[in-house]
Curated annotation (Swiss-Prot):
Biological source species: Bdellovibrio bacteriovorus (strain ATCC 15356 / DSM 50701 / NCIMB 9529 / HD100)
Gene: serS
Recorded domain comment: Consists of two distinct domains, a catalytic core and a N-terminal extension that is involved in tRNA binding.
A GO CC annotation given for this chain: cytoplasm
NCBIfam families: serS
Name recorded for this polypeptide: Serine--tRNA ligase
Tagged with keyword ATP-binding: yes
UniProtKB keywords: Aminoacyl-tRNA synthetase, ATP-binding, Cytoplasm, Ligase, Nucleotide-binding, Protein biosynthesis
UniProt catalytic activity: tRNA(Ser) + L-serine + ATP = L-seryl-tRNA(Ser) + AMP + diphosphate + H(+); tRNA(Sec) + L-serine + ATP = L-seryl-tRNA(Sec) + AMP + diphosphate + H(+)
């Protein structure tokens, strides 16, 4: 959420933060109308507060005169009537100011974050900037199959029966695919906790609406989540939501920053707006597993932490020997709450394309302001932390990448060396 007070101040460049934020919205391809409405409403709110304070001061002054008049035996009825009028005015003005304040808050909740200055300006994924390529895209002497063809041929993925029991965008993993999914989760969690020092966490798989508001999913993306009817509970779209809200409305000690967590969870998404996209296979499911990295960082260190977090996600791909690239998203392709995002895209030979397998973002204080997560230095005032998170990795898409990159001409699939100890020493998948 944006800092309304900051919008009224001058930036170090000499321009106002309002102008900078407005330009940030333009760079995102977002409307600036709401920002302008916020400024007008905030101006109105201040005027109403001033009027209420003036009326209150007059009321207090007259109230003081009433006692004097009564002590002198005079008639204070006229002043009493005037005080009653002022009391009514104060209540009305304060109510209008509170209403304007709520309107400002409601509007502020639907404005996206301001992009960091290092983010390239662009309108779509074609304007994203390739940062690096790791590994050579896998090429075969035979026609590469897509993962769903391999999964069905090996009898380890069943989409048809999932469609019968549940519906579209679901799958049964069985045999070697189920074993590999479980092995990947364990492998990723071990790597992040044992090598990189993240604290393991398994969060609740349901959250309340306040938590979704804190991360920026609500109110703008309410249609993207599954709601448990008759309650204030929602299935999580990502572990980012419960883990970010772990410190909701708390003040941390500066010396305890950064705090880093790795969390496994299933994720549930309605995929509203994705009609016709990736309708076959595991790429876009209503339910999928993911390992998430989450860091609460000092504002002075957050962009340094962002680089480290992204490299930790990359390490999983390198250990599995999967070709990938890192892409810096442009302003028009970033998520709503992000100030800067790197996507990791893994090579899929069956599609002959790079596909997203991880998104690593620095939200700066955008989420912390919404969820009221702060830290305090010794003797200092509370400040908002910076929050960062990244998929490390989307487990189903990692399974997809292994099937497609390790496929063989005879229809079998090899298992990455790093994963073999997690699969009982198994080296391949055959029917």
């Amino acid at each position: 959420m944006i800092d309304i007070k900051l919008l009224e101040k001058k930036a170090e460049t000499g321009t106002s933060y309002y102008d900078e934020y407005k330009q940030g919205l333009v760079n995102r391809g977002a409307s600036t109308e709401v920002l302008e409405q916020i400024m007008e409403l905030n101006k109105k709110r201040k005027e109403l507060i001033t009027q209420a304070e003036t009326a209150k001061a007059s009321q207090n002054k007259l109230s003081g005169e009433i006692g004097k008049i009564k002590r002198e035996g005079g008639d204070a009825s006229a002043i009493l009537a005037e005080v009653d009028v002022l009391k009514t005015q104060v209540k009305e003005l304060e109510a209008k100011a509170a209403e304007a304040d709520q309107q400002v808050t409601n509007l502020a909740l639907v404005i996206p974050n301001k992009p960091h200055s290092s983010v390239p300006v662009g309108s779509s994924e074609k304007d994203n900037k390739e940062i690096k390529v790791v590994g050579t895209p896998t090429q075969f002497s035979f026609k590469a199959k897509e993962h769903w063809e391999l999964g069905e041929a090996l009898n380890i993925i069943d989409f048809e029966r999932a469609g019968k029991t549940t519906g579209t965008r679901f799958a049964f993993l069985k045999g070697a695919a189920a074993q590999m999914e479980r092995a990947l989760i364990q492998f990723m969690m071990d790597k992040h906790s044992m090598k990189h020092g993240y604290t393991e966490m398994i969060p609740p798989f349901m959250v309340n609406s306040n938590s979704l508001l804190g991360t920026g999913n609500f109110p703008k993306f309410k249609e993207d989540v599954f709601h448990l009817e008759g309650s204030d509970l929602y299935l999580i779209p990502t572990a980012e939501v419960p883990v970010t809200n772990y410190y909701n409305n708390e003040i941390l000690d500066e010396k305890d920053l950064p705090q880093s967590f790795c969390a496994y969870s299933p994720c549930f998404r309605s995929e509203a707006g994705s009609a016709g996209r990736d309708t076959k296979g595991l790429i876009r499911q209503h339910q999928f597993d993911k390992v998430e990295l989450m860091v609460f960082a000092h504002p002075d260190k957050s962009h340094e932490v962002h680089e480290a977090l992204t490299s930790h996600a990359e390490q999983i791909l390198m250990d599995l020997e999967l070709p990938f690239r890192r892409v810096l998203l442009c302003t028009g392709d970033m998520g709503f709450g992000s100030a800067k995002t790197y996507d990791l895209e893994v090579w899929l030979p069956g599609q002959n394309a790079y596909r997203e397998i991880s998104s690593c973002s620095n939200f700066e204080d955008f989420q912390a302001r919404r969820a009221n997560i702060r830290f305090r230095s010794a003797g200092g005032k509370p400040q908002f932390v910076h929050t960062l998170n990244g998929s490390a990795l989307a487990v189903g898409r990692t399974l997809v990448a292994i099937l497609e990159n390790y496929q063989r001409e005879d229809g079998s699939v090899g298992i990455p060396k790093a994963l073999q100890p997690y699969m009982g020493g198994r080296t391949e998948i055959r029917k």
